[in-house]
Design a protein with these regions (language model features):
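A short linear hydrophobic-aromatic micro-motif
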Residues: 151, 160-163, 197-202
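Structural signature of PLP-dependent enzymes
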Residues: 104-111, 128-151, 179, 183
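Active-site PLP attachment segment
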Residues: 67-103
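Conserved glycine-rich beta-strand-loop-beta hairpin in the small C-terminal domain of fold type I
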Residues: 122, 126, 141-151, 163-176
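PLP-dependent enzyme catalytic core of the Aspartate aminotransferase-like
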Residues: 3-7, 189-198, 204-238
Length: 238
């Protein structure tokens, strides 16, 4: 399916989420290498969004696109997810092809407010990457435990789900299809009765029908409330 899409002449760019959001999929090096070969074959440029690169769990390992890249490509990322600094609006990118890089820089300099990054964002990123490793390690353990808590509670309440934590990200992509619920009815119950807003899967297209995306990147006390309210909302419809 991917090769068929890349072979179409109207498709010029592959937008890649690595790790993938919302599923939490970690692409293996072999998978990425195959993608790179196909993109080079059909002259398709790649833009790889790797903002969740630090949030990879267990034995899974993140492979940056730069390690397998061919042809035209860009790798975009930020410390905002890892260090909770999105309000500083800082991000950075790598562009492998010199002509593309120079063209991008030229276009960037012609845009008001974009030609120079925020000094505060730069300072925060430098500090985070130079001194934040112990904090990030602790955060990773905390978030991984949060995801295990979700699995424990959901599977305890609804064994047929058999939900497993994702390979990456602190976002729980939960398949509720075994429960045969109406997505919009569940959202109505969660918001109006349980007072909790959880991202419905249909926000991401028809493939997301029957799923919800729960953010585990928060204090355990808040997560516990959210999970218990999700369980209560589901029970209301069963």
């Amino acid at each position: 399916a991917l090769e068929a899409a890349l072979a179409k002449p109207e498709n010029k760019i592959l937008l890649l989420w690595s790790p993938q959001n919302p599923t939490g999929k970690v692409w293996t090096r072999d998978e990425l290498t195959h993608m790179a070969e196909l993109c080079a074959r059909y002259d398709v440029a790649v833009i790889s969004d790797e903002i969740h690169m630090d949030m990879v769990w267990g034995e899974h390992r993140h492979t940056p696109w730069s390690a397998v890249a061919r042809g035209k490509w860009a790798l975009l990322t930020s410390g905002s997810k890892s260090f909770n600094i999105p309000a500083l609006t800082g991000a950075y990118g790598l562009i492998g092809d010199e002509a593309s890089r120079n063209g991008y820089l030229s276009a960037l300099k012609g845009r008001d407010g974009l030609s120079s990054p925020s000094v505060l964002a730069l300072t925060a990123h430098i500090a985070a990457y130079q001194q934040g490793a112990p904090w990030l390690d602790a955060l990773r353990h905390y978030l991984e435990d949060n995801l295990l808590y979700i699995a424990q509670e959901l599977n305890g309440a609804f064994p047929e789900l058999n939900w497993q934590p994702p390979e990456a990200t602190y976002l729980a992509w939960i398949d509720l299809r075994p429960l045969n619920l109406d997505d919009r009815s569940l959202q109505k119950v969660l918001i109006e009765q349980q007072k909790v807003a959880i991202m419905p899967g249909y926000t991401y297209g028809n493939e997301g029908n029957g799923f919800v995306r729960l953010n585990a990147g928060c204090p355990r006390s808040k997560l516990e409330q959210g999970v218990q309210r999700l369980i209560a909302g589901i029970n209301t419809l069963r």
